[in-house]
Amino acid sequence: HESSFMGVFGSDEEAAHVLSAIKEIGLDNSHSRFEKGENGCARVKIDEGDRIFLGSNSGGVTREYPIQLTEEDREYLNQFELIHMGLYSHVNHLLEELQNVSGKISYDFSDDFTEEEVQRAIDKVDFGFFSIEDFSDEEVKQFLMKHFCERNDVLIATRGEKTAIGYDGAKFYEVNPVLEEPVDTMAAGDSFLTAFLLYFLEGDDIVTAMKMGNEFAGKSCLVDGSFGFGIHYD
């Protein structure tokens, strides 16, 4: 599968490290922006395999210099079957404009969304992902039903070690996670949604795609930093 990244890079060591990882992977970032300042960065600690956020710079240059699409960007985006963004991408201002692209739109609402943020985006995306660990099964189902709208294909709530629940407007789908002794749970949710979307868009049913998402998330929890490329810093 071919993929690319369109974002805003800073001018610090963190930016240089991310760019070197992207280059080594072979990920296209030809439509990214480069600005002077801090790259988006979060500080975390790992406690018995669980990642705990200590703070961040709120997106750094991604927040300070939000992307405005050019005509070349729009033509480029139309090459893709799927465009993924999230609550921390600082691109909500593009949601209306992206209604004109040919591909599906996926959105990660993460775990600290507000009702206002959900309402602002939910009717403009095909796939919505939520991290909701403290809700009961019934509360999750009520939440997904409440927010599902005509535009949506599938909404999914992942819940750590609990059952992931999906909803397509007619039926709920529940899949148990693949439980491994984690090395680092960083980006487990991102891994889930990536695999889910790939399999679902290739024609697999929702349950099969969710199972593949759980399997890939389990594997990513066995890798430091979710995909490696770690460096030491002070």
Regions found by a protein language model. Give the residues of each.
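Conserved N-terminal subdomain of the carbohydrate kinase-like
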Residues: 2-81, 234
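Flexible, active-site-proximal loop/turn residues at the rims of small-molecule/cofactor binding pockets
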Residues: 38, 89, 134, 161, ...
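Conserved phosphate-binding/catalytic region of the ribokinase-like
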Residues: 141-234
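Short, well-ordered alpha-helical microsegments
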Residues: 15, 91-95, 114-118
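Active-site glycine-rich loop that binds ribose-phosphate moieties when present
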Residues: 62-72, 86, 108-117, 138
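Glycosyltransferases and closely related glycan-assembly transferases
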Residues: 78-79, 92-105
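Conserved phosphate/ATP/ADP-binding segment of small-molecule kinases
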Residues: 99-105, 109-174
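Short catalytic-loop micro-motif centered on adjacent basic/acidic residues
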Residues: 4-7, 82-85, 105-108, 129-130
